[in-house]
């Protein structure tokens, strides 16, 4: 893929999980895989292929005293996603100097899959926050859920806060294809091949791209090459 589209700027951001960043909190002698060697090898391979590897590990370790991950779930928190966005912005040459946000808690009763599957800390609940951009120049986005043929003016499906899967607040969960349109001054399109970690990450990018096309390879069965041509991804 990288070779076929060498004319496109390409980036890869792999979310390290909490075991990697918060290894000091693991029980003594807990068996874990060495994520760092795997990520380092992946970084080398992608770099050789012309893909810019966005490494957030050092940034996360600098902020590991903050809640970067949910206590009951495997995902990063919105705070963690924000730090990942700042690191990505440096690599992607995005100017974040004017970015300001209001951090708003939307629930304090989230219980994620780690707790649900293991039964550990079954009484503990997490807080989910959203970062709302502020200022006079905030642009409104339109979110198009392609397969569902549904549009929304918000990244957040608050109805999901009344369900067991409260993390689905972000975009209502995972979808094969989502298109985000924002009337930015620059006419640029970003294609994001993603998993669920991106759901709380991509909203930070919306103010900087005229169009963002999110594709989840786990559910998308269309022709990606054709999609790139149709959407004028550069």
Language-model segments: which ranges?
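Extracellular glycan-modifying ectodomains
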Residues: 1-234
């Amino acid at each position: 893929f990288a070779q076929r589209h060498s004319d496109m700027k390409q980036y890869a951001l792999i979310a390290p999980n909490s075991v990697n960043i918060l290894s000091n909190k693991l029980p003594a002698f807990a068996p874990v895989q060495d994520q760092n060697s795997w990520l380092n090898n992946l970084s080398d391979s992608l770099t050789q292929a012309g893909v810019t590897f966005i490494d957030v590990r050092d940034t996360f370790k600098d902020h590991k005293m903050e809640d970067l991950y949910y206590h009951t779930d495997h995902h990063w928190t919105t705070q963690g996603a924000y730090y990942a966005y700042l690191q990505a912005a440096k690599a992607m040459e995005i100017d974040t100097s004017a970015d300001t946000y209001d951090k708003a808690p939307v629930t304090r009763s989230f219980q994620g899959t780690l707790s649900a599957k293991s039964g550990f800390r079954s009484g503990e609940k997490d807080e989910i926050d959203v970062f709302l951009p502020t200022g006079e120049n905030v642009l409104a986005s339109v979110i198009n859920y392609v397969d569902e043929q549904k549009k929304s003016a918000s990244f957040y499906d608050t109805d999901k806060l009344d369900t067991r899967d409260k993390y689905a607040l972000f975009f209502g969960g995972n979808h094969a294809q989502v298109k985000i349109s924002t009337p930015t001054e620059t006419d640029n399109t970003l294609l994001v091949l993603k998993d669920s970690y991106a759901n709380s990450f991509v909203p930070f990018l919306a103010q900087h791209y005229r169009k963002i096309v999110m594709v989840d390879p786990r559910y998308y069965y269309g022709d990606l090459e054709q999609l790139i041509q149709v959407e004028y991804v550069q």
